[in-house]
A protein has these predicted regions:
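PLP-dependent amino-acid enzyme catalytic core
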Residues: 1-310
Length: 310
């Protein structure tokens, strides 16, 4: 029987879990450490799930027409995912992004046909959101999916990411670790896993120098994709048991380490999440437990960043 897909959107999801056996051995971890490799999505990141969910939700609600112009403020991966889905569906798309994001991200969005508007990096995501709102007022037929406020974001993870984790581990998952950007991943996955097993520990990861969830104080940091500098509307702040702040240098070092030890090339926020997961796995109370860490994207869009600096 043929197993042939007719659209790139059909390739989104069903990403694999990889046990990080080399890191388990290196750090003498007594817990089992499983990485969900989201770079297996067609446009290379977990945000493919969110992009597809937001566009399909808008289409079902009659909010999009062939004349629609999608405008989205994004630090990168959602823009790449939206550009991919928009290209396949024939929509014009404008991405508004802080100029502090990697040059590879810009090139990838342009490769999918997106138009780019850059905002000052010092303004963070707040600056990009304000500019997107301004453009939406000026451009006819514009629609902002709005990943920071759109409930289709966490719902995508509740409906796809979390069930995949549950099924692939046969329900044997004791802790879930994820970085917080919009908060969609940890909210959606956390809710589903909690419904299945209230004892599952949900751990959020944020940049140490912009520890908004821990301290309420935003700041500059180098971990692209997490640490938006505010508490996003879609984030359920009651869903996580613990927040682990991660230093930029630890995120970079761990991101490099998984490539060189496991043969898996991932991005900066993956390094941050993995550093936190390793710290969790070192704790004596987690001996014999299974920890799942979500690694959001591929490292090849960070080759120009300090992640892979010589």
């Amino acid at each position: 029987m043929e197993n042939i897909y007719t659209s790139a959107a059909q390739l989104i999801g069903h990403t694999p879990l990889l046990e990080l056996t080399h890191l388990e051995k290196k750090y003498d971890l007594k817990a089992r450490l499983l990485a969900k490799l989201e770079y297996f999505n067609p446009a290379g990141s977990v945000k493919d799930r969110v992009a597809l969910a937001m566009i399909e939700d808008a289409e079902q609600k009659g909010l999009l027409t062939p004349q629609s112009v999608l405008i989205e403020p994004t630090s990168g991966n959602t823009g790449i995912g939206l550009a991919s889905v928009a290209a396949a569906r024939g929509y014009r798309i404008i991405i508004v992004m802080p100029d502090s994001m990697s040059v590879e991200r810009r090139q990838l969005m342009k490769a999918y046909g997106a138009e780019l508007v850059l905002t000052p990096g010092a303004q963070g995501m707040k600056g990009a959101i304000a500019k997107a709102d301004e453009l939406a007022r000026e451009i006819p037929h514009s629609f902002i999916p709005g990943q920071f406020v759109n409930q289709a974001n966490p719902q995508a993870h509740y409906a796809t990411t979390a069930p995949e984790i549950w099924q692939d581990t046969d329900g044997q998952v004791d802790a879930f670790v994820a970085g917080v950007g919009t908060g969609g991943t940890i909210t959606g996955v956390g809710r589903y896993l909690r419904e299945k097993n209230p004892a599952v520990r949900i751990v959020a990861v944020e940049p140490k120098t912009s520890a908004v969830l821990s301290t309420g104080v935003p700041g500059k940091h180098g971990i692209q994709g997490i640490g938006a500098g505010f508490v996003p509307a879609v984030l359920d702040t009651k869903i996580y048991d613990e927040v682990i702040p991660v230093a930029d240098e630890d995120a970079f070092a761990t991101g490099r380490e998984i490539g060189q030890s496991e043969g898996v090339l991932v991005g900066i926020s993956s390094g941050a999440a993995l550093w936190a997961a390793i710290e969790l796995a070192k704790r004596p109370e987690n001996a014999g437990k299974t920890i799942v860490v979500l690694l959001p994207d591929t490292g090849d869009r960070y080759l120009s960043t300090p992640l892979f600096a010589d």
